[in-house]
Regions:
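Phosphate/diphosphate-binding glycine-rich loops and adjacent basic-rich segments that engage nucleotide
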Residues: 20-94
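Generic structural signal for well-ordered, non-membrane alpha-helical segments
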Residues: 30, 114-118, 156
């Protein structure tokens, strides 16, 4: 949102970790890979968007686990990678070194491949352009970032 102070469009992405299971995958290969964008407007409040590419943000999942909330359908995958579409249980699939979160959409039929594709794209932008070399070389604790700001009047 710092770009808004200068009447600029700001974008930020983060990649890394291994919490997201690819569509039809059996192992977590990507992080939640969130994106944030802020766009100034002339007379109205700015457009600000921030979202993970998984069905639920990692920090929100941790918070809900601490307060004893139940899993919702489509948040996580079973150990074999199949989406858990029943929900209602504890966070058993979300614990341990591999959280097995699903891409937004949960299943191929509901469009999970689209958010998985976005997550890979964000990983490329973050990892490759920052010399982080992408998810193949980042261990679970490392992150790579992409940050940009565009002058709106530069496109007029």
């Amino acid at each position: 949102m710092m770009a808004l102070e200068y009447d600029m469009v700001g974008t930020c992405m983060t990649a890394g970790g291994n919490t997201m299971v690819p569509t039809f995958g059996a192992e977590a290969k990507l992080g939640t890979n969130p994106i944030a964008i802020a766009v100034p407007t002339l007379n109205k409040p700015p457009f600000v968007f921030d979202a993970a590419t998984t069905t639920i943000a990692g920090n929100k999942m941790g918070l809900l686990e601490r307060i004893g909330a139940e899993m919702q359908p489509g948040w996580v995958a079973h150990d074999d990678g199949t989406p858990d579409m029943n929900g209602g249980g504890e966070f058993q699939y979300a614990k341990g070194p591999q959280r097995m979160q699903l891409p937004l959409g949960s299943t191929r039929e509901l469009g999970s491949h689209k958010c998985y594709g976005l997550a890979v794209s964000f990983d490329i932008m973050c990892g490759m352009l920052s010399n982080g070399f992408g998810f193949k070389t980042l261990d679970a604790s490392r992150r790579a970032h992409y940050v940009s700001a565009f002058r709106v009047d530069g496109f007029a």
